[in-house]
Design a protein with these regions (language model features):
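Terminal targeting/leader modules
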Residues: 2-3, 8-160, 175-195
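Amphipathic alpha-helical interface segments used for dimerization/assembly
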Residues: 162-174
């Protein structure tokens, strides 16, 4: 999906990653894209807040996509205190023009995945509406744009393999903008300062 001037980093994908290995055994991606699945958790609200909202949805994890996940969301766990849902088939692509956003993420103490999600208006796969991830990114700028648009954005730590992959991309593609010295206002004529 592309909008003018903004490249979306998530596309629903019909060709999941062919790797059948677990996250710890997954080699870092060799290209500029990786397919992932998002795990959302519905948990019971405790305390006084539970009078108004008995349940809440939170982002649980982002994992490499596997062919065994299929294409549709599915429930992984159901209990009295929580449910977990797996949402497969998200393609995360790294774009050169967003290298600074990746740089800001990769150089923090805790690089992370950013996931924008929305609650279904009507239930489609369960008895009640579930949280549906919409986009996944590794860019601070993407997360900022989504938050500016009043979307729900959550984050979870990215594994070491993904951080190394992201750092390699940043090293190859990020070019810091040169700092320009601004002339102090006091040295500009009144015409320049006030039009």
């Amino acid at each position: 999906m592309q909008r003018s001037g903004v490249k979306a980093v998530l596309q629903p994908c019909r060709h999941p990653l062919q790797s059948e290995c677990m996250l710890t055994d997954t080699p870092p991606p060799s290209s500029t894209q990786i397919q992932v699945a998002v795990v959302m958790r519905r948990e019971r609200v405790q305390g006084a807040m539970s009078r108004w909202q008995p349940w809440r949805w939170v982002l649980a994890d982002v994992v490499p996509n596997e062919a065994a996940f299929g294409e549709e969301p599915r429930q992984l766990r159901h209990g009295d205190e929580e449910e977990q849902w797996l949402h497969p088939g998200f393609l995360v692509q790294l774009h050169r023009d967003d290298a600074e956003g990746y740089y800001l993420n990769a150089t923090t103490d805790a690089p992370c995945w950013f996931v924008m999600w929305r609650l279904e208006e009507q239930a489609t796969v369960a008895a009640e509406p579930i949280a549906r991830p919409v986009m996944v990114s590794l860019s601070y700028y993407d997360a900022g744009r989504w938050l500016d648009a009043q979307e729900t954005v959550e984050q979870v730590p990215a594994p070491v393999e993904i951080v190394q992959w992201l750092s390699g991309f940043v090293e190859e593609n990020h070019v810091p903008e040169p700092k320009r010295r601004r002339r102090p206002e006091s040295f500009r004529s009144l015409q320049d300062r006030f039009g």
